[in-house]
Amino acid sequence: MRIIQTTGKRKTAIARAVIREGKGRVRINGKPVEIIEPEIARFTILEPLILAGEEIWNSVDIDVKVEGGGFMGQAEAARMAIARALVEWTGDMSLKEKFMKYDRTMLVGDPRRTEPHKPNRSTKGPRAKRQKSYR
């Protein structure tokens, strides 16, 4: 039995996916993907499976464990882990090209991070300045 492990990251969220032969079950932190809320996060997670096609989707089981970040960062990290797992599972360069054409961040990480707040104005954000008064 073949088992492949992959990871995906987005902002501070980290997802680890395990893919094995199965019947098309996808679980995120032990929950079936069908009950993941909000809907936009569910559709984001399912994108690589829809692009890969029914025959690939129905031949594998995918378990994803996600931690850190917000719901959308977690969804995008899970999407990346699933996409990488499917490419490795099939060994198909045309699938990799399809993912890259659709959205490059499915396979390649996004390096952007939040800017740290600076001293003296920590609640207002990293670049906020003190208000200047002329009289």
UniProtKB/Swiss-Prot annotation:
InterPro entries: Ribosomal_Su5_D2-typ_SF (IPR020568), Ribosomal_uS9 (IPR000754), Ribosomal_uS9_archaeal (IPR019958), Ribosomal_uS9_CS (IPR020574), Ribsml_uS5_D2-typ_fold_subgr (IPR014721). Residues 119-135 have a biased composition (Basic residues). One of its GO terms (molecular function) is RNA binding. Keywords: Ribonucleoprotein, Ribosomal protein. GO terms for cellular component: cytosolic small ribosomal subunit. Transmembrane segments: none annotated. Residues 107-118 have a biased composition (Basic and acidic residues). SUPFAM superfamilies: Ribosomal protein S5 domain 2-like. GO terms for biological process: maturation of SSU-rRNA from tricistronic rRNA transcript (SSU-rRNA, 5.8S rRNA, LSU-rRNA); translation. The keyword Ribosomal protein applies. Pfam families: Ribosomal_S9. Residues 107-135 are annotated as: Disordered. Belongs to the universal ribosomal protein uS9 family. This is Small ribosomal subunit protein uS9. It comes from Pyrococcus furiosus (strain ATCC 43587 / DSM 3638 / JCM 8422 / Vc1).
